[in-house]
Each structure stands twice: as C-alpha cells, then as structure tokens.
C-alpha cells in the first residue's frame, strides 16, 4: 500500500504537469490518502520500503554512478564538495533551526553507508516508499484543503524523526515553503524531485535555456543525447529492421 500511495500521488502530480506544467501550491491527494494513513498507522519508527543490494547479490548502478564513478552528483545546493567531488559539508540549512538540515544528513549517511563524509559504495539501499512520504502526502492534502493544524501535525511528526525543532504555522516560514522544503529533504534520491520542480516552477541553473525542461516544462525523461540517439524509440528513426 505504501508503493501504491506513491504511485497514485505521482499520478496526481503527472495530471497537473500534463498537458502543461503550471506553478501552484499544495495538491489534494484523495486517491492516496487511505493507503497513506494505513501505512502511517501500521508502521512507525521511520519505516522505509527499500530495495537492498550487496556484494553477494547485486549492485545498484545508480549508487555506483553517484558514489564511485561520480558521473552523477548530489546537488550542490544541498552539499559542498572538495576538488575530487567528494562531499565535505552540508550546504542546505533547515529553515526553522537555521542549521544543517538533519533529515538530509540522515539520508546521506544512509546513502554513504554510515557517514556522508565517506565515499560510499555501490550497495546502499534505494528507498521506494517510506513513512515520511506517507506523512507528506497527508500533510499536503490537509494544506490544500485548508486544514493547517493537520498539516502542521504531520510536518512536526516528520521533523521529530530527526530531533528537529517544531514548525509553527504562521511564522517566518510559510506553509507552502515548509512543504516544499520538507519534501525536498525527506525524498532525496527517490526520483521525485523533477515533478516537484515542475509543479512549483523551480528551475536549475544548470538547465540549458533551449532544453525541454525550460521550453516545455513537464518532460519526465531526462536522459542524455547519446542515449537518445542510440534508442530507436526516441531518435526519430524508428525501430524497423
């Protein structure tokens, strides 16, 4: 049910992005709520549904590309790196406490095998769904329906998992800004960021001005030109013969 809640949430976001992505605030997730609430009630303890890897089974190609080959990197708005592109600090602060975000640190520690300052390997778990995601679904739906108290309660339940100070609605950080930040920090490396960027009108300074991401926001197949040219389903030449 946790995976289904993620899938129906993603479908709701997809429907907002297509045919044209428009910036907005919180969304209602009516098709996801029952599953999300069930998982929250049935789990706890910062539960995650993971794909696990090991030297005795199989490796994670994405993990290898980030941790070892470094073909892909953690965004530099989140971390700082040294001359070898190894993480040497946290760039993203929590908007309430003003110090390095604890949810981000916890996820990066997991990703690097215990300590985000180490190089890591090709075997960290991939998080497919989690208690945090379920609470984010419930929180956003509550905010979209004007139930600020329920939104705040879910956000603070997530923050409590890391020992963060409580968020108080109506303060210096707006509810929407808190939602956006909490999703970003708690869904790192889950493949959900691009949809959030599109629906909230966020762009990356690395995106080329003539890219599909800029010209036609909503594109969800961000692969390299080499891969496009090699794929007969994408290169415009067809697959016949």
Regions found by a protein language model. Give the residues of each.
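A short, structured loop/turn motif at beta-sheet edges
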Residues: 146-148, 172
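Short, low-complexity, Pro/Ser/Thr/Gly-rich segments in the mature regions of secreted, periplasmic
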Residues: 223-241
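Active/binding-pocket-proximal capping segment
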Residues: 150-161
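Hydrophobic-face positions in mid-chain alpha helices that act as interaction patches
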Residues: 9-16, 20-135, 164-166, 174-178, ...
